[in-house]
Amino acid sequence: PIDTTDNASLQRGAESFVSYCLTCHGASYMRYNRHRDIGFSNEQILNKLVYTGQKVGDLMQSAMRKKEGEEWFGVVPPDLSVIARSRGADWLYSYLRAFYRDDSTVTGWNNLVFDRAAMPHVLYQLQGEQRLTIKSGDKGEQKSLLLDKTGNMTVAEYDKFVGDLVNYLV
């Protein structure tokens, strides 16, 4: 559930974004100092969110150069400050929970929400590994995901983690 007044959730989401997403995805319409709005002090921003020698007033740029992203993934990883607003919270939440193992792809991962996404499942150690199951029936194919290998988090913990991350991004 999205609650932009829940500063604890927003702070957890900000820390998760910096730890897991900012290497490849920028949030270039956001400055680090805006994290004061959710209760971080400048010192906390520098200690918890800025790892690349940037200043508190700088834009949140990806550490990856666009050329590298295109070489590695075939496409430049999108800016998540744009994706969150264009796709919305429900889409992003579903997307981050819908990765599954797929040996036919370059990354070894696919996504039930966005087929053939170039992004590998960077959160698989937290969520675990899912596999796609397809059942045919009267209403056509029914696709679902089953957890094959558990991750470091329970399903409920991972759902909360993703919820905090999405809450922060939107």
Task: Report each predicted region and the residues it spans.
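The canonical Cys-X-X-Cys-His
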Residues: 17-28, 165
